[in-house]
Swiss-Prot record:
This is Probable non-functional T cell receptor beta variable 5-7. Pfam families: V-set (PF07686). InterPro entries: Ig-like_dom_sf (IPR036179), Ig-like_fold (IPR013783), Ig_V-set (IPR013106), TCR_beta_variable (IPR050413). Glycans are attached at residue 90. Disulfide bonds join 42-110. The gene is TRBV5-7. GO terms for cellular component: plasma membrane; T cell receptor complex. It is found in: Cell membrane. One of its GO terms (biological process) is adaptive immune response. The keyword Cell membrane applies. Keywords: Adaptive immunity, Cell membrane, Disulfide bond, Glycoprotein, Immunity, Immunoglobulin domain, Membrane, Receptor, Signal, T cell receptor. Alpha-beta TR is a heterodimer composed of an alpha and beta chain; disulfide-linked. The alpha-beta TR is associated with the transmembrane signaling CD3 coreceptor proteins to form the TR-CD3 (TcR or TCR). The assembly of alpha-beta TR heterodimers with CD3 occurs in the endoplasmic reticulum where a single alpha-beta TR heterodimer associates with one CD3D-CD3E heterodimer, one CD3G-CD3E heterodimer and one CD247 homodimer forming a stable octameric structure. CD3D-CD3E and CD3G-CD3E heterodimers preferentially associate with TR alpha and TR beta chains, respectively. Probable non-functional open reading frame (ORF) of V region of the variable domain of T cell receptor (TR) beta chain. Non-functional ORF generally cannot participate in the synthesis of a productive T cell receptor (TR) chain due to altered V-(D)-J or switch recombination and/or splicing site (at mRNA level) and/or conserved amino acid change (protein level). Alpha-beta T cell receptors are antigen specific receptors which are essential to the immune response and are present on the cell surface of T lymphocytes. Residues 1-21 form the signal peptide.
Amino acid sequence: MGPGLLCWVLLCPLGEGPVDAGVTQSPTHLIKTRGQHVTLRCSPISGHTSVSSYQQALGQGPQFIFQYYEKEERGRGNFPDQFSGHQFPNYSSELNVNALLLGDSALYLCASSL
């Protein structure tokens, strides 16, 4: 496993109702190398004030990373400190992952609720 090995980070919208329900993530996909930093942004459905983020590794079910409600962290899964988040006044949020590891290669999901 040389230093050129790529870590794939993919995103997929997850929300209530149809795909065009309004939850958006950016960027929609990324290719990063180990050791790099990544910021993933999530915009909730209009009127929703709660945003949750999940990681889904290949062959696994989604794992809860964190939930923000009214700009405060209300819950956190069993993830290391390299995973952090923030919710902005407009209720959009971001997930930051510092010093990417090969094991961080996964599908990252975002959901919003009232």
